Amino acid sequence: MKKAIKIIASIIIIVLVLLFGAEWWLEGKIKKTASEQIYEKTGGRIIADVGRVNISLIGRKVNIEEVTFRTDTTRPVMPGIPFEYADGLIRTITVKGIHYHKKDSAISVSARQFELDIPQATLISAKDAEDKRPEKTDTLGQQMKLAIGNFDLHLGDIFWKQHQHQDTVSYFVQELKWHMDDWKIDTAPDSIHPPCLCEDIRISLNGFQNQFARNSQLLEIDSLSINGKERMISVGRIALIPRYPMEEFALKSPGHTDWTKITAGKITLYGWDMQRLLKEQFLQIDSVDLQQADIASFKNRKIEQRKKVKRLFYQSVQQLPLHFAVRRVNLNHIDVKYLELSENGERPGTITFNRLNGMFYDLTNVSRPHQAYYTLKAEGKLMDRGVMRASFRLPIAPRNDLFEVEGHLGAMSITDLNPMIEPLVKIRVVSGELDDLKFRIKGDSIQSKVDMVFLYWDLKVRLLKEKDGEIKVRSFLTTLANGLIFTENNPNHRGERQVEATAERDVYRSQFNYLWRSLLAGLKKSIGL
């Protein structure tokens, strides 16, 4: 009996020694191989030091700690490497409960837990690194299943600069935490979008910055929170900040011709269906709430710009790569300012829309038999004076190119429009009161028709010219216009004037310009032009 016990004990000791020896050998092998491979692949430019490696064969666990990266800038950048500069720390990589199985061409990998913690990293991509899809090979015929019980990713301060042709763009992420429960990916042969499933997802972010090419604009996000089970997404302040003055922007950033500044308050998405997004690649949201936004845009026509066809709003929605449906989008307190400097102008024309509130109803890019349009209803003030209301019916399906806009503008002095009219068309409104303006626009992406009733009285103008940097009045033409061309009042002795007019869309101009052209066609007819 004692002999049997000794034999068993000896076997156990031998097994443990072999087991611990194998673990010790694997730990050293991983530590050495990782450093050598990175050094060799980068020609000694990127140097990695692995602090500790712990392996438990019985527990099916791998833990790697304190991996540091640094760059020897005296070494040349080898062609084909992804990064020309890397500096940072991987605090820990932990994988527990690892299982690997292969049968024929099917591979299955699973883990009970995966954790990656990178508190700090600075990465600069190599200039010749290209983001290309891998060529189709026989490996695409394999089926691979990946399953992770608990997935945890933590990124501290991460800076990444990417080369883009002869320019660079950069990204900065601050305190990203990403957690998923029961994450699964199952790829079928030749699958383009393999199904990705998880029971829950929680993401939090304390800050994000994206520096655009040519240092033209900076995108900032203060915070982000995504919760799958609570079906809510929350975004803190968002800002798009131009990096050059308005007058110089088009010259210094030809890829971004319009100076645009946007700041938005809190954006909250309620009732998003995480499971439908993962299974069907369809984003379904119950409601979106936007609290406060300021939008300013400036177009400088004195600087020659490359012409680019611009899509209308509904065309952009139709062409989004992801199908989506949002029951309601609530817009609260939005201020919009648009400035335009004409080719021969010295100061820009300005128009403002103040304290806008609106609601999108059934916003989607997936047409259904009972829904061909979605609707936007909005109200606010024009030039912080006249109360305006508008309703937009916009098409869902790409084959439907018809839209409708119906609106109303309340009483205001027409002279309040001089900041827009005078610099752009060289006309100054001396007097004139708007009583009521009603319009209906029907059109497509080529042409629109407007029906308008523009009620006003005591309209008088001065026609201007600019000479030697000074604005002067065209006296004779002003007298002619007020006496013979312009209709001073509507209604007048002939009664109320209702007009119809058409407008052609300039495909190189914005949606706002198209609406303005449509309204201007009706306004001209209303005053007798």
Where does each model-flagged region fall?
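Terminal hydrophobic membrane-targeting helix
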Residues: L18-L123, G141-Q142, I148, H163-G265, ...
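Extended terminal
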Residues: K2-A9, P395, D401, H408, ...
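Flexible, solvent-exposed coil segments and beta strand-coil junctions
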Residues: D72-P76, D131-K136, R202, Y244-L251, ...
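Flexible, surface-exposed loop regions and adjacent strand-edge segments
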Residues: D128-P134, I303-V309, L424-V425, K467-V473
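Hydrophobic membrane-insertion alpha-helices, especially the h-region
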Residues: K6-G21
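Elongated, acidic membrane-bridging lipid-handling scaffolds
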Residues: V95-I98, K102, I107-R231, K310-F403
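Glycine-rich, small/hydroxylated-residue low-complexity segments
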Residues: V109-F114, I203, E280-R301, Q315-F324, ...
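Outer-membrane beta-barrel proteins
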Residues: L123-A126, P245, S297-K299, V461-L463
